[in-house]
Amino acid sequence: MLEDAIKDLFGGMVPGELPRRWERFSDVAILPHGSFRGDAWASDDPLWEAVAGALGAKRLARMGEVSGEFRESGVEMLLGEDDWVVRRESGVDYGYAMTRCMFSAGNVNERRRMGEVASEGDVVVDLYAGIGYYTLPALVHGGATVHACEWNPEAVKALRWGLDANG
């Protein structure tokens, strides 16, 4: 489907390598870091609209490197300006600005496990809380008392949103 959309846009040709994978949730598709880079690709709205349409998304972003002492996201918005996303995972809603906060999709089992190992009466200290990867499941599913520590102001905003959204 993506290849067909690119061929339609470029007169039957594919001017460069297409991504073989991407992440899709809500109304956004996130492409790998190296996708659609280089002189062969005209990086303008018609390209991004075609890619988003082929992937069934309204917004399109491209992964970047996590950097800095705050571990800030390097995600770049390609289509759409609103970078706020909500992911629901194991009954927990995580909201964050994807161009400013990272989300570690690979820790899904640990996030779920935190809701299983924490229980009412437990006191948990989450020293690197981020957007609430472990804090929120410990509260939502475990009922523990959690002291969450985070120094990235954008992650703190997202964590506060998650606390409100998850009750």
Language-model-detected regions and their locations in the chain:
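Rossmann-like S-adenosyl-L-methionine
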Residues: 81-167
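Acidic/glycine-enriched edge-of-secondary-structure segments
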Residues: 1-11
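Non-catalytic substrate-recognition/targeting regions of SAM-dependent transferases
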Residues: 9-25, 30-31, 44-106
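Generic alpha-helical secondary structure
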Residues: 3, 40-48, 156
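Flexible, active-site-proximal loop/turn residues at the rims of small-molecule/cofactor binding pockets
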Residues: 35, 66, 152
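Short histidine-centered catalytic/ligand-binding loop motif
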Residues: 32-41
